[in-house]
Amino acid sequence: MLVSDPRSRRIPKIVGTNNGTFTGFSHMRVLTTAPDEVRELLAHWTEGSSLVVVALCAAWCDTCNEFRASFERIAEARPDILFVWLDIEDDSDVCGDIDVENFPTLAIYRGDALLHFGISLPQQSTVARLVDEMASRSAGGSAAPDAVVSLPRTLRRHFA
């Protein structure tokens, strides 16, 4: 799982959890290794005005691997927004029953309200425009499976 920190421009990579104990890290800049800090970042999600962008991808997906650098650049350019990268297999304990038909799939929330759920072109400019559009929305209205709608609560429970 990758979580950006809206308080800074650095992005941590958290790989594999075992009941909240982190088991490894990637080559990326690591901001936090403490579960309390991850919980604090996820608490940011509950603030009604906070925008959260979740990329649902897979490590084996070449498109996802190419898209990841673009996703990180968008996160660095928008420190006011929380960005979360979930690997649907490595983070299956969090993703649960979310059915991803193609990659990358994005879920964008304002607080717990889902604004957008769908496949995106893996282009930085396309995703940046989508994020900007969703940032200007004040309320949700995207239809999606229950597992997607409840993802904010699932993540918070996972790190509780």
Predicted segments with their positions:
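Structural micro-motif
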Residues: 98-107
